[in-house]
């Protein structure tokens, strides 16, 4: 029983890495570099991200032929490289795992590439949910 105690102590003191659940206003601050890029406003981004990942940096959605990763749900078929997709185009030249961390710098760089190639319609939530009536997506700090 004594040999189990140190393991238990380590488990308590160093919990597993958990998803960073951001708030709307915290995320608004993190997305300053993206605001206005390709004429997409910050409230539009906050709305899109809420609907696709719930502001969860470690969100992964499994589809029939690919997975989508992180806040922006970037797919491993075209934009990032994962161990589960055999032939990713990896346009963003990034591991999908990097899209699950709390550093959004590389995520935003990839998002800009996606916008340049596919436009905002890459995010299916935009048109039906986030293209107008965006009052609720403004943060008081904006």
Swiss-Prot record:
InterPro entries: Glyco_hydro_22, Glyco_hydro_22_CS, Lactalbumin, Lysozyme-like_dom_sf. Disulfide bonds join 25-139, 47-130, 80-96, 92-110. Residues 1-19 form the signal peptide. Its main location: secreted. Ca(2+) binds at residues 98, 101, 103, 106-107. It is found in: Secreted. PROSITE patterns: GLYCOSYL_HYDROL_F22_1, GLYCOSYL_HYDROL_F22_2. One of its GO terms (biological process) is lactose biosynthetic process. One of its GO terms (cellular component) is extracellular region. Regulatory subunit of lactose synthase, changes the substrate specificity of galactosyltransferase in the mammary gland making glucose a good acceptor substrate for this enzyme. This enables LS to synthesize lactose, the major carbohydrate component of milk. In other tissues, galactosyltransferase transfers galactose onto the N-acetylglucosamine of the oligosaccharide chains in glycoproteins. This is Alpha-lactalbumin. It comes from Cavia porcellus (Guinea pig).
């Amino acid at each position: 029983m004594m040999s189990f105690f140190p393991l238990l102590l380590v488990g308590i003191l160093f919990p597993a890495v958990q998803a960073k659940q951001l708030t709307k206003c915290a995320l608004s601050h993190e997305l300053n570099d993206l605001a206005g890029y390709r004429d997409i406003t910050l409230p539009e981004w906050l709305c899109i991200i809420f609907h696709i990942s719930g502001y969860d940096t470690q969100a992964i959605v499994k589809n029939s032929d690919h997975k989508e990763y992180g806040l922006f749900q970037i797919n491993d078929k075209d934009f990032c490289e994962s161990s589960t997709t055999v032939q990713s185009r990896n346009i963003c030249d990034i591991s999908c795992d990097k899209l699950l961390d709390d550093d959004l710098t590389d995520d935003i760089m990839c998002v800009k590439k996606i916008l340049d190639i596919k436009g905002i319609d890459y995010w299916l939530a935009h048109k039906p949910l986030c293209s107008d009536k965006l009052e609720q997506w403004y943060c008081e700090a904006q």
